[in-house]
């Protein structure tokens, strides 16, 4: 057998899949990399879908990494289908290493008829600046071929279970915290690739009109600064945006609010307890009672971090939301209503505006003034 194909298998047993594809962001002793692939071709004479698995070791020679084994196999397969456009999908236990990432970029550049989507269970060395730059080069090349990288969510794990695992018709049983780990990795990948928000998404969700219908999602944009010589210095690698997770989406049976998703990812930043940090959030809705309580608890447990919250609108479910805002205020979080300056800052920083300036909607300033007065009354416990 060709040595490149020795580690090509048709399927894996359930325990091996759950062990190797577990998506906890930091995992030790997972040195085997699994790559499940699907290859589809376009056109009326397309051959059937090809789907198998390669495996390799992280610390072995580069030629033994599963990505390189796939390329070796694919080069032979491609000779039979040279003129056809191909859609290649990978499902990987680890994202490609730095060298493999560069080889993936070369592979795509040499064959423009191939598109590649990479779903990863975990991110390899995501804190390393060189690795972050390699991922950006692979996924953000504007004038050339690029890969589309995503974090595996419940649907992808279930697909792999059904497609590549000898499950004997057993249902996929997600492990504890699968959806939470997905959100953390999704946010981290967004930070690395510097994802931007669609302009319509921003203007629709951050519009501060007092009466909005159908705005059930909460968007949260954030940035982090570190105090250096009495000056706040922006940490460019620590900014991004996210939204709440709706019920039954990505494995969340009850959903998860944006603020809680945000708190989930902060521990993975490894903020130095000897330094001072300022975290600023720009939210389409102010926090609900539970989220406000959790954010206040975070501040109390992390004295080296200060929190500033700018909200486009005030969330009020006629419950304890006002009490939650007062709890945040008492915990010394700075809570304010977004004004034109904050909307423009978010537009310039978090939106894929393609060079277009921020255009304020009618009565933006008037709505901000009214909401600011209402927030002051809530924090002073007036009329409650």
UniProtKB/Swiss-Prot annotation:
One GO MF term attached to the UniProt entry: zinc ion binding
Residue numbers bearing the Phosphothreonine modification: 32, 218
Catalysis performed (reactions): a 2'-deoxycytidine in single-stranded DNA + H2O + H(+) = a 2'-deoxyuridine in single-stranded DNA + NH4(+)
Source species, domain of life: Eukaryota
Record: active site: 259 (proton donor)
Principal EC category: hydrolase
Broad class of where this protein is predominantly found: cytoplasm
Binding site for Zn(2+) 1: 65, 97, 100
Quaternary data: Homodimer.
Biological role: DNA deaminase (cytidine deaminase) which acts as an inhibitor of retrovirus replication and retrotransposon mobility. After the penetration of retroviral nucleocapsids into target cells of infection and the initiation of reverse transcription, it can induce the conversion of cytosine to uracil in the minus-sense single-strand viral DNA, leading to G-to-A hypermutations in the subsequent plus-strand viral DNA.
Domain notes: The CMP/dCMP deaminase domain 1 mediates RNA binding, RNA-dependent oligomerization and virion incorporation whereas the CMP/dCMP deaminase domain 2 confers deoxycytidine deaminase activity and substrate sequence specificity.
Name of the protein this chain belongs to: DNA dC->dU-editing enzyme APOBEC-3G
UniProt organism field: Pongo pygmaeus
Gene that encodes the chain: APOBEC3G
